[in-house]
Amino acid sequence: MHSTTRREWLGAIGATAATGLAGCAGVGGAGQPVTVGSLLPLSGPGSLGALAADHQRAIDTAVEHANRGGGINGRDVVHVSKDTEADPSVAADRYATLAADESPLAIVGPVLSGVTTALTEQAAADAQLLVSPSTTAPAIATAGRSDGQKFVARTCPNDSQQAAVMAKIVDDDMYAAADTATILYVDNAFGAALADVLADRLGADLLASVPYQGGTDTPGGPVDDALAPDPDAVAFIGSPGSSSGVIDELVGREYGGEIALSSALASASSPPSWNGAYTATVNSASTVGTKRLRRALSDATPLQPYTENAYDAAALALLAASYSGDPTPRAVAGALQSVSGGVGHSITVGDFGRATDLIDAGRELNYNGATGNVDLTAALEPVTGYLIQQLTDAGIETRELLKSGYFTDGGDA
Protein backbone atom coordinates (compact mmCIF):
# COMPACT_ATOMS: atom_id res chain seq x y z
CA MET A 1 0.00 0.00 0.00
CA HIS A 2 1.44 3.38 -1.00
CA SER A 3 0.57 6.23 1.33
CA THR A 4 1.62 9.82 0.79
CA THR A 5 3.98 11.20 3.43
CA ARG A 6 3.48 14.58 5.06
CA ARG A 7 6.54 15.92 3.25
CA GLU A 8 4.95 14.96 -0.07
CA TRP A 9 1.70 16.55 1.05
CA LEU A 10 3.27 19.87 1.88
CA GLY A 11 5.07 19.80 -1.46
CA ALA A 12 1.78 19.17 -3.23
CA ILE A 13 0.07 22.01 -1.40
CA GLY A 14 2.79 24.38 -2.55
CA ALA A 15 5.14 26.73 -0.77
CA THR A 16 2.71 29.64 -0.61
CA ALA A 17 -0.13 27.60 0.85
CA ALA A 18 2.18 25.87 3.30
CA THR A 19 3.48 29.23 4.55
CA GLY A 20 -0.06 30.49 5.06
CA LEU A 21 -1.06 27.36 6.95
CA ALA A 22 2.03 27.55 9.12
CA GLY A 23 1.01 31.08 10.10
CA CYS A 24 -2.34 29.77 11.33
CA ALA A 25 -0.92 26.91 13.37
CA GLY A 26 -0.73 27.31 17.10
CA VAL A 27 -3.22 30.19 17.31
CA GLY A 28 -5.22 28.35 19.97
CA GLY A 29 -8.81 28.56 18.77
CA ALA A 30 -8.29 32.02 17.21
CA GLY A 31 -9.52 31.00 13.75
CA GLN A 32 -13.03 30.04 12.73
CA PRO A 33 -14.02 26.54 13.89
CA VAL A 34 -13.84 23.69 11.42
CA THR A 35 -16.77 21.33 11.03
CA VAL A 36 -17.23 17.58 10.97
CA GLY A 37 -20.67 16.72 9.65
CA SER A 38 -22.72 13.56 9.99
CA LEU A 39 -25.71 12.07 8.20
CA LEU A 40 -27.45 9.59 10.51
CA PRO A 41 -30.92 7.95 10.64
CA LEU A 42 -31.74 9.57 14.00
CA SER A 43 -35.48 9.09 13.52
CA GLY A 44 -35.17 5.87 11.53
CA PRO A 45 -37.50 2.91 12.15
CA GLY A 46 -36.92 0.16 14.67
CA SER A 47 -33.46 -0.02 16.18
CA LEU A 48 -31.97 2.42 13.65
CA GLY A 49 -32.69 5.41 15.86
CA ALA A 50 -30.82 3.89 18.80
CA LEU A 51 -27.94 2.93 16.51
CA ALA A 52 -27.75 6.47 15.12
CA ALA A 53 -27.79 7.97 18.62
CA ASP A 54 -24.74 5.89 19.60
CA HIS A 55 -23.00 6.86 16.36
CA GLN A 56 -23.70 10.52 17.06
CA ARG A 57 -22.15 10.24 20.52
CA ALA A 58 -19.11 8.43 19.13
CA ILE A 59 -18.52 11.25 16.65
CA ASP A 60 -19.00 13.81 19.44
CA THR A 61 -16.35 11.93 21.42
CA ALA A 62 -13.86 12.03 18.53
CA VAL A 63 -14.44 15.78 18.19
CA GLU A 64 -13.97 16.24 21.94
CA HIS A 65 -10.69 14.32 21.76
CA ALA A 66 -9.51 16.48 18.86
CA ASN A 67 -10.32 19.71 20.70
CA ARG A 68 -8.63 18.44 23.84
CA GLY A 69 -5.56 17.78 21.69
CA GLY A 70 -5.39 21.31 20.30
CA GLY A 71 -7.89 21.18 17.43
CA ILE A 72 -6.97 21.44 13.75
CA ASN A 73 -4.10 23.90 13.29
CA GLY A 74 -5.26 25.58 16.49
CA ARG A 75 -8.88 25.82 15.35
CA ASP A 76 -11.70 24.27 17.36
CA VAL A 77 -13.81 21.50 15.81
CA VAL A 78 -17.61 21.37 15.90
CA HIS A 79 -19.92 18.52 14.96
CA VAL A 80 -23.10 19.26 12.98
CA SER A 81 -25.45 16.30 12.50
CA LYS A 82 -28.41 15.93 10.14
CA ASP A 83 -31.18 13.32 10.29
CA THR A 84 -31.55 11.24 7.12
CA GLU A 85 -34.71 9.52 8.43
CA ALA A 86 -33.26 6.42 6.67
CA ASP A 87 -34.67 7.85 3.42
CA PRO A 88 -32.45 8.49 0.36
CA SER A 89 -34.41 11.56 -0.79
CA VAL A 90 -34.40 13.12 2.67
CA ALA A 91 -30.69 12.32 2.96
CA ALA A 92 -30.01 14.11 -0.34
CA ASP A 93 -31.72 17.26 0.94
CA ARG A 94 -29.92 17.14 4.30
CA TYR A 95 -26.60 16.48 2.56
CA ALA A 96 -27.06 19.53 0.33
CA THR A 97 -27.86 21.74 3.32
CA LEU A 98 -24.96 20.41 5.36
CA ALA A 99 -22.43 20.78 2.55
CA ALA A 100 -23.59 24.28 1.58
CA ASP A 101 -24.07 25.77 5.06
CA GLU A 102 -21.23 24.15 7.02
CA SER A 103 -18.48 23.29 4.48
CA PRO A 104 -17.49 20.25 6.57
CA LEU A 105 -14.01 18.77 6.21
CA ALA A 106 -15.77 15.39 6.11
CA ILE A 107 -19.23 13.94 6.64
CA VAL A 108 -19.49 10.75 8.71
CA GLY A 109 -22.19 8.59 7.16
CA PRO A 110 -24.57 7.69 5.80
CA VAL A 111 -25.29 4.48 7.69
CA LEU A 112 -27.38 2.48 5.21
CA SER A 113 -25.98 1.17 1.93
CA GLY A 114 -28.96 2.39 -0.09
CA VAL A 115 -28.69 5.91 1.29
CA THR A 116 -24.93 6.10 0.81
CA THR A 117 -25.14 4.78 -2.75
CA ALA A 118 -27.66 7.50 -3.60
CA LEU A 119 -25.20 10.23 -2.53
CA THR A 120 -21.90 9.04 -3.98
CA GLU A 121 -22.20 10.72 -7.37
CA GLN A 122 -23.12 14.10 -5.86
CA ALA A 123 -20.38 13.87 -3.23
CA ALA A 124 -17.79 13.26 -5.94
CA ALA A 125 -19.10 16.15 -8.02
CA ASP A 126 -18.89 18.41 -4.95
CA ALA A 127 -15.48 17.05 -3.88
CA GLN A 128 -17.11 16.38 -0.50
CA LEU A 129 -15.71 13.50 1.56
CA LEU A 130 -18.15 10.93 2.97
CA VAL A 131 -16.83 8.36 5.47
CA SER A 132 -19.45 5.71 6.22
CA PRO A 133 -19.13 3.60 9.38
CA SER A 134 -21.44 0.85 8.15
CA THR A 135 -22.07 0.88 4.38
CA THR A 136 -20.86 -2.54 3.30
CA ALA A 137 -22.14 -2.58 -0.32
CA PRO A 138 -19.38 -3.79 -2.69
CA ALA A 139 -20.13 -1.02 -5.22
CA ILE A 140 -18.83 1.61 -2.79
CA ALA A 141 -15.27 0.39 -3.49
CA THR A 142 -15.33 2.08 -6.90
CA ALA A 143 -17.90 4.82 -6.25
CA GLY A 144 -17.37 8.48 -5.51
CA ARG A 145 -14.41 9.29 -7.77
CA SER A 146 -13.73 12.62 -9.44
CA ASP A 147 -10.59 13.98 -11.12
CA GLY A 148 -8.61 10.91 -10.09
CA GLN A 149 -9.51 11.19 -6.40
CA LYS A 150 -11.93 9.19 -4.24
CA PHE A 151 -14.41 11.02 -2.01
CA VAL A 152 -16.30 8.07 -0.49
CA ALA A 153 -14.61 6.01 2.22
CA ARG A 154 -15.69 3.56 4.90
CA THR A 155 -14.37 2.09 8.12
CA CYS A 156 -16.29 -1.20 7.82
CA PRO A 157 -15.44 -4.19 5.60
CA ASN A 158 -16.61 -4.54 2.01
CA ASP A 159 -19.28 -7.23 1.68
CA SER A 160 -17.15 -8.93 -0.96
CA GLN A 161 -15.24 -10.29 2.05
CA GLN A 162 -18.43 -11.61 3.64
CA ALA A 163 -19.40 -13.20 0.34
CA ALA A 164 -16.04 -15.00 0.23
CA VAL A 165 -16.59 -16.35 3.75
CA MET A 166 -20.13 -17.51 3.05
CA ALA A 167 -18.95 -19.17 -0.17
CA LYS A 168 -16.25 -21.00 1.78
CA ILE A 169 -18.86 -22.26 4.26
CA VAL A 170 -21.03 -23.56 1.43
CA ASP A 171 -18.23 -25.07 -0.67
CA ASP A 172 -15.53 -26.26 1.72
CA ASP A 173 -15.35 -29.92 2.76
CA MET A 174 -14.83 -28.75 6.37
CA TYR A 175 -18.32 -27.25 6.39
CA ALA A 176 -21.30 -27.79 4.05
CA ALA A 177 -19.32 -29.40 1.18
CA ALA A 178 -22.27 -28.52 -1.04
CA ASP A 179 -22.58 -29.39 -4.70
CA THR A 180 -25.78 -27.33 -5.00
CA ALA A 181 -27.07 -24.27 -3.15
CA THR A 182 -29.75 -21.61 -3.06
CA ILE A 183 -29.55 -18.04 -1.76
CA LEU A 184 -32.36 -16.55 0.34
CA TYR A 185 -31.82 -12.80 0.73
CA VAL A 186 -33.54 -9.72 2.16
CA ASP A 187 -34.80 -7.59 -0.70
CA ASN A 188 -32.98 -4.31 -0.10
CA ALA A 189 -29.78 -2.67 -1.38
CA PHE A 190 -27.60 -4.58 1.10
CA GLY A 191 -29.18 -7.98 0.50
CA ALA A 192 -29.33 -7.76 -3.28
CA ALA A 193 -25.72 -6.60 -3.57
CA LEU A 194 -24.38 -9.32 -1.27
CA ALA A 195 -26.46 -11.97 -3.04
CA ASP A 196 -25.02 -10.94 -6.41
CA VAL A 197 -21.42 -11.11 -5.19
CA LEU A 198 -22.04 -14.41 -3.38
CA ALA A 199 -23.54 -15.93 -6.53
CA ASP A 200 -20.31 -15.14 -8.37
CA ARG A 201 -18.14 -16.63 -5.60
CA LEU A 202 -19.95 -19.93 -5.10
CA GLY A 203 -18.35 -23.10 -6.42
CA ALA A 204 -21.59 -24.99 -5.85
CA ASP A 205 -24.25 -24.90 -8.56
CA LEU A 206 -26.70 -22.11 -7.72
CA LEU A 207 -30.21 -23.49 -8.14
CA ALA A 208 -32.18 -20.39 -7.10
CA SER A 209 -31.76 -16.91 -5.64
CA VAL A 210 -34.89 -15.94 -3.71
CA PRO A 211 -35.72 -12.48 -2.28
CA TYR A 212 -37.95 -11.86 0.75
CA GLN A 213 -39.30 -8.71 2.35
CA GLY A 214 -37.78 -7.69 5.67
CA GLY A 215 -40.27 -8.00 8.52
CA THR A 216 -42.63 -10.12 6.42
CA ASP A 217 -45.55 -11.79 8.18
CA THR A 218 -45.64 -14.55 5.55
CA PRO A 219 -42.15 -16.06 5.40
CA GLY A 220 -43.39 -19.44 4.20
CA GLY A 221 -43.45 -18.59 0.50
CA PRO A 222 -39.82 -17.48 0.13
CA VAL A 223 -38.63 -20.39 2.27
CA ASP A 224 -40.64 -22.80 0.10
CA ASP A 225 -38.98 -21.37 -3.00
CA ALA A 226 -35.48 -21.64 -1.50
CA LEU A 227 -35.99 -25.27 -0.46
CA ALA A 228 -37.94 -26.46 -3.50
CA PRO A 229 -34.83 -27.43 -5.57
CA ASP A 230 -33.59 -29.54 -2.60
CA PRO A 231 -30.20 -27.78 -2.31
CA ASP A 232 -27.30 -29.14 -0.28
CA ALA A 233 -27.02 -25.74 1.42
CA VAL A 234 -28.95 -22.49 1.82
CA ALA A 235 -27.02 -19.23 2.07
CA PHE A 236 -29.20 -16.87 4.09
CA ILE A 237 -28.68 -13.09 3.87
CA GLY A 238 -30.55 -10.86 6.27
CA SER A 239 -30.61 -7.91 8.63
CA PRO A 240 -30.89 -8.11 12.44
CA GLY A 241 -34.48 -8.00 13.64
CA SER A 242 -36.28 -7.80 10.31
CA SER A 243 -35.03 -11.24 9.17
CA SER A 244 -35.49 -13.31 12.32
CA GLY A 245 -38.96 -14.56 11.36
CA VAL A 246 -37.69 -15.89 8.04
CA ILE A 247 -34.77 -17.64 9.75
CA ASP A 248 -37.17 -19.20 12.26
CA GLU A 249 -39.29 -20.46 9.37
CA LEU A 250 -36.24 -21.87 7.58
CA VAL A 251 -34.74 -23.71 10.55
CA GLY A 252 -38.16 -25.01 11.54
CA ARG A 253 -38.49 -26.98 8.33
CA GLU A 254 -37.46 -30.62 7.98
CA TYR A 255 -34.46 -29.72 5.86
CA GLY A 256 -31.39 -31.93 5.91
CA GLY A 257 -28.92 -29.53 4.31
CA GLU A 258 -26.63 -26.91 5.84
CA ILE A 259 -27.40 -23.24 6.46
CA ALA A 260 -24.89 -20.38 6.16
CA LEU A 261 -26.02 -17.12 7.79
CA SER A 262 -24.71 -13.67 6.94
CA SER A 263 -23.00 -11.58 9.60
CA ALA A 264 -24.69 -10.08 12.68
CA LEU A 265 -27.74 -12.37 12.63
CA ALA A 266 -26.66 -14.98 15.19
CA SER A 267 -25.75 -14.47 18.84
CA ALA A 268 -25.27 -16.50 21.98
CA SER A 269 -28.97 -15.91 22.72
CA SER A 270 -30.23 -17.25 19.38
CA PRO A 271 -32.94 -19.93 19.74
CA PRO A 272 -31.80 -23.57 20.03
CA SER A 273 -33.59 -24.25 16.74
CA TRP A 274 -30.79 -22.32 15.00
CA ASN A 275 -28.14 -24.77 16.25
CA GLY A 276 -26.00 -26.27 13.53
CA ALA A 277 -26.12 -23.20 11.31
CA TYR A 278 -22.84 -21.56 10.34
CA THR A 279 -22.25 -17.82 10.27
CA ALA A 280 -19.69 -15.36 8.90
CA THR A 281 -18.56 -12.95 11.63
CA VAL A 282 -16.21 -9.97 11.47
CA ASN A 283 -13.20 -10.64 13.69
CA SER A 284 -13.57 -7.71 16.09
CA ALA A 285 -10.42 -7.07 18.09
CA SER A 286 -10.73 -5.74 21.64
CA THR A 287 -7.85 -3.28 21.66
CA VAL A 288 -6.73 -0.42 23.88
CA GLY A 289 -8.74 1.86 21.59
CA THR A 290 -11.85 -0.31 21.93
CA LYS A 291 -11.64 -0.21 25.71
CA ARG A 292 -11.06 3.55 25.79
CA LEU A 293 -14.12 4.26 23.68
CA ARG A 294 -16.29 1.89 25.70
CA ARG A 295 -15.22 3.68 28.87
CA ALA A 296 -16.03 7.05 27.30
CA LEU A 297 -19.50 5.76 26.37
CA SER A 298 -19.95 3.51 29.40
CA ASP A 299 -23.54 4.63 30.00
CA ALA A 300 -24.48 3.30 26.53
CA THR A 301 -23.13 -0.24 27.08
CA PRO A 302 -23.54 -2.43 25.13
CA LEU A 303 -22.79 -0.21 22.15
CA GLN A 304 -24.96 -0.45 19.06
CA PRO A 305 -23.38 -2.08 15.96
CA TYR A 306 -20.75 -0.04 14.14
CA THR A 307 -20.44 2.56 16.93
CA GLU A 308 -16.68 1.96 17.07
CA ASN A 309 -16.56 2.38 13.29
CA ALA A 310 -18.30 5.76 13.62
CA TYR A 311 -15.64 6.97 16.05
CA ASP A 312 -12.89 5.76 13.72
CA ALA A 313 -14.52 7.50 10.74
CA ALA A 314 -14.48 10.86 12.52
CA ALA A 315 -11.05 10.33 14.07
CA LEU A 316 -9.43 9.41 10.75
CA ALA A 317 -10.90 12.48 9.05
CA LEU A 318 -9.66 14.75 11.84
CA LEU A 319 -6.20 13.20 11.82
CA ALA A 320 -6.05 13.55 8.02
CA ALA A 321 -6.97 17.23 8.33
CA SER A 322 -4.19 17.81 10.83
CA TYR A 323 -1.72 15.73 8.81
CA SER A 324 -2.37 17.53 5.53
CA GLY A 325 -2.40 20.95 7.17
CA ASP A 326 -5.52 21.76 5.16
CA PRO A 327 -8.99 21.07 6.63
CA THR A 328 -10.76 20.89 3.27
CA PRO A 329 -12.54 17.77 2.00
CA ARG A 330 -10.18 17.33 -0.95
CA ALA A 331 -7.05 17.47 1.23
CA VAL A 332 -8.60 15.27 3.93
CA ALA A 333 -9.67 12.65 1.36
CA GLY A 334 -6.16 12.62 -0.06
CA ALA A 335 -4.50 12.14 3.32
CA LEU A 336 -6.95 9.60 4.76
CA GLN A 337 -5.02 6.51 3.65
CA SER A 338 -1.72 7.95 4.88
CA VAL A 339 -2.85 8.29 8.51
CA SER A 340 -4.75 5.00 8.56
CA GLY A 341 -1.77 2.66 8.41
CA GLY A 342 1.72 1.93 7.21
CA VAL A 343 4.92 2.13 9.24
CA GLY A 344 4.22 5.28 11.23
CA HIS A 345 3.89 5.76 14.97
CA SER A 346 0.90 3.89 16.39
CA ILE A 347 -1.87 6.07 17.81
CA THR A 348 -5.31 5.18 19.06
CA VAL A 349 -8.49 6.54 20.64
CA GLY A 350 -7.86 9.74 22.59
CA ASP A 351 -4.32 10.25 21.23
CA PHE A 352 -5.03 13.33 19.11
CA GLY A 353 -2.68 15.61 21.05
CA ARG A 354 0.14 13.08 20.73
CA ALA A 355 -0.65 12.69 17.03
CA THR A 356 -0.38 16.46 16.54
CA ASP A 357 3.02 16.48 18.23
CA LEU A 358 4.20 13.68 15.95
CA ILE A 359 2.93 15.49 12.86
CA ASP A 360 4.66 18.71 13.94
CA ALA A 361 7.88 16.70 14.33
CA GLY A 362 7.56 15.38 10.76
CA ARG A 363 6.64 11.83 11.82
CA GLU A 364 4.21 9.45 10.14
CA LEU A 365 1.08 8.05 11.80
CA ASN A 366 -0.49 4.58 11.95
CA TYR A 367 -4.01 4.74 13.40
CA ASN A 368 -5.12 1.69 15.36
CA GLY A 369 -8.56 2.72 16.46
CA ALA A 370 -11.67 1.56 18.27
CA THR A 371 -12.07 -1.25 15.71
CA GLY A 372 -8.38 -2.17 15.78
CA ASN A 373 -6.17 -1.93 12.71
CA VAL A 374 -7.93 0.28 10.14
CA ASP A 375 -5.37 0.25 7.29
CA LEU A 376 -7.29 1.65 4.32
CA THR A 377 -6.65 0.39 0.80
CA ALA A 378 -6.59 2.63 -2.28
CA ALA A 379 -10.37 2.12 -2.34
CA LEU A 380 -10.45 3.83 1.09
CA GLU A 381 -11.77 0.75 2.88
CA PRO A 382 -10.23 -1.67 5.40
CA VAL A 383 -9.58 -5.36 4.83
CA THR A 384 -10.34 -7.19 8.03
CA GLY A 385 -10.31 -10.75 9.31
CA TYR A 386 -13.42 -12.93 9.56
CA LEU A 387 -14.46 -15.87 11.71
CA ILE A 388 -16.38 -18.91 10.57
CA GLN A 389 -18.59 -19.79 13.52
CA GLN A 390 -21.27 -22.35 14.26
CA LEU A 391 -24.23 -22.25 16.61
CA THR A 392 -24.20 -25.13 19.10
CA ASP A 393 -25.78 -26.09 22.42
CA ALA A 394 -22.81 -24.39 24.09
CA GLY A 395 -23.34 -21.12 22.23
CA ILE A 396 -21.40 -19.82 19.22
CA GLU A 397 -18.18 -21.72 18.58
CA THR A 398 -15.41 -20.51 16.28
CA ARG A 399 -14.38 -23.04 13.63
CA GLU A 400 -11.80 -21.01 11.71
CA LEU A 401 -10.13 -17.59 11.60
CA LEU A 402 -9.61 -16.13 8.14
CA LYS A 403 -6.98 -13.41 8.49
CA SER A 404 -6.96 -10.35 6.25
CA GLY A 405 -4.35 -12.02 4.04
CA TYR A 406 -6.93 -14.62 3.04
CA PHE A 407 -8.82 -11.91 1.16
CA THR A 408 -5.82 -10.08 -0.29
CA ASP A 409 -4.01 -13.25 -1.39
CA GLY A 410 -6.87 -14.67 -3.43
CA GLY A 411 -8.47 -16.88 -0.81
CA ASP A 412 -5.46 -18.82 0.43
CA ALA A 413 -5.63 -19.00 4.21
UniProtKB/Swiss-Prot annotation:
Keywords: Cell membrane, Chemotaxis, Membrane, Signal. It is a peripheral membrane protein. Residues 1-31 form the signal peptide. Its main location: membrane. Transmembrane segments: none annotated. InterPro entries: BCAA_transport, Leu-bd, Peripla_BP_I, TAT_signal. Disruption phenotype: Mutants completely lose the chemotactic response towards leucine, isoleucine, valine, methionine and cysteine, but they still respond to arginine. GO terms for cellular component: plasma membrane. It is found in: Cell membrane. The keyword Cell membrane applies. PROSITE patterns: TAT (PS51318). It comes from the Archaea. GO terms for biological process: chemotaxis. Mediates chemotaxis towards five attractant amino acids (leucine, isoleucine, valine, methionine and cysteine). May function as a receptor that binds the amino acids and transduces a signal to BasT. Has probably no additional role in transport. This is Chemotactic signal transduction system substrate-binding protein BasB. The gene is basB.
